[in-house]
């Protein structure tokens, strides 16, 4: 052959580990066989993607022609450069190559590419492929009859030779073996490297935990969260909370109301919350009343001390609880005073806005009464020129018209 082909290895764009042997036209991605099965078996839409082999010369484009003389698969441009440049290479036996879609099995791919995985004859694989693959071997081996007649005359021997995969046949054989082992060991799942995040970068594989250990850990956690759980191994009894008594007790002590099995009602919790809320409200009311009385008494004491010039230090000996209630009530009183002031300011603003709106409406009505509807001429020069221009049927006559 006149030109020398450069054999370059292209890594798979999905896993980044194995050599890419297929080119997906829809995704414009180069994939190895396991990743191709993994990607295009995701849904029905991805199964429609047409894939074909990668050119042996440029390793960038999908193949369109197979050269039997040089045992190469070439894209359209490389085929034109190789076989269209000289007359000697134009006589090489070539055939068109078509892509495939779907998710063919390992045996079907091996039969298409002429690779013997199970030791069977290629004719048996060819018959199996014709029945199951969804497209005949003629589209793979010889391509379209019209294209084949335009290239070179072909015979039966050309069909038998059309199974050659090119220079990457050994790589395809290894990936088919890997794919076959993945189907057998994984029960139909494709063996794809773990940690792939889509961009070709591989992350560290996360440690896996067996399903049995997860069940055991869940059962242990469930036993540890039971209400009557007792640690017999250490000899220490755990305290449990009794919602009926409102306090904690030992698991061995009998409860007034025994719970039956796993049926557990939260009525006691609701009652407990309601009782707590009622107690808090009562305590708040009492503290508010006490503070009100203290405030009135302190006010009177201050007035008396002012009149008698005696410092008002009457209630300085109050307990800490009373002082806490006093601070709480003062905070509430201050908040209520601020809210009252805010409401008063808002009402004043609304009244001012209403008054301003009434004044504006009155001014508008006064202007409307004195409004004059006289016909005024805004552009006097245009008016004068329009009166002197010639009209025909009410329309102006252009200066260029005769």
From Swiss-Prot:
Database matches in Pfam families: CCT
Zn-finger segments (B box-type): 12-54, 55-97
Binding site for Zn(2+) 2: 55, 58, 78, 83
Principal subcellular localization: nucleus
Region (Disordered): 287-322
Polar residues compositional bias, start-end: 295-310
Residues of the CCT domain: 357-399
Gene Ontology, cellular component aspect: nucleus
PROSITE patterns: CCT, ZF_BBOX
Cited InterPro entries: CCT_domain, CONSTANS-like_Bbox1, Znf_B-box
GO molecular function: DNA-binding transcription factor activity; zinc ion binding
Similarity section: Belongs to the CONSTANS family.
Protein's UniProt name: Zinc finger protein CONSTANS-LIKE 14
Species, as recorded: Arabidopsis thaliana
């Amino acid at each position: 052959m006149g030109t020398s082909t450069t054999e370059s290895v292209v890594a798979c764009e999905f896993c980044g580990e194995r050599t890419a042997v297929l080119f997906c036209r829809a995704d414009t991605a180069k994939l190895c066989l396991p990743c191709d099965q993994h990607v295009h078996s995701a849904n029905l839409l991805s199964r429609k993607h047409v894939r074909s082999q990668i050119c042996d010369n440029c390793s960038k484009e999908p193949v369109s022609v197979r050269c039997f003389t040089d045992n190469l698969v070439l894209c359209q441009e490389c085929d034109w450069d190789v076989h269209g440049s000289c007359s000697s290479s134009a006589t090489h036996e070539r055939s068109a190559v078509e892509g495939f879609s779907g998710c063919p099995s390992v045996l079907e791919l091996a039969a298409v590419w002429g690779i013997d995985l199970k030791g069977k004859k290629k004719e048996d694989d060819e018959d199996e492929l014709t029945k199951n693959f969804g497209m005949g071997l003629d589209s793979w081996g010889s391509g379209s009859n019209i294209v084949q007649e335009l290239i070179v005359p072909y015979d039966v021997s050309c069909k038998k030779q059309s199974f050659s995969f090119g220079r990457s046949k050994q790589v395809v054989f290894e990936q088919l073996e890997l794919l076959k082992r993945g189907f057998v060991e994984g029960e139909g799942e494709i063996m794809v490297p773990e940690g792939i995040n889509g961009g070709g970068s591989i992350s560290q594989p996360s440690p896996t935990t067996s399903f049995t250990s997860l069940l055991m850990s869940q059962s242990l956690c469930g036993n540890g969260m039971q209400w009557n759980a007792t640690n017999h191994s250490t000899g220490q009894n755990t305290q449990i909370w009794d919602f009926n008594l409102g306090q904690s007790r030992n698991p061995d002590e009998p409860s007034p109301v025994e719970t039956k099995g796993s049926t557990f009602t939260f009525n006691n919790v609701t009652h407990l919350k309601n009782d707590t809320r009622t107690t808090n409200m009562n305590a708040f009311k009492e503290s508010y009343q006490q503070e009100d009385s203290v405030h009135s008494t302190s006010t009177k004491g201050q007035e008396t001390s002012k009149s008698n010039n005696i410092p008002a230090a009457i209630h300085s000996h109050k307990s800490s609880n009373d002082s806490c209630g006093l601070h709480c009530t003062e905070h509430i009183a201050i908040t209520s005073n601020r809210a009252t002031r805010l409401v008063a300011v808002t009402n004043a603003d609304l009244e001012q806005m209403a008054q301003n709106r009434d004044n504006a409406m009155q001014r508008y009505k006064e202007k409307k009464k004195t409004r004059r509807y006289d016909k005024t001429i805004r552009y006097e020069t245009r008016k004068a020129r329009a009166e002197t221009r010639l009209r025909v049927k009410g329309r102006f006559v252009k200066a260029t018209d005769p």
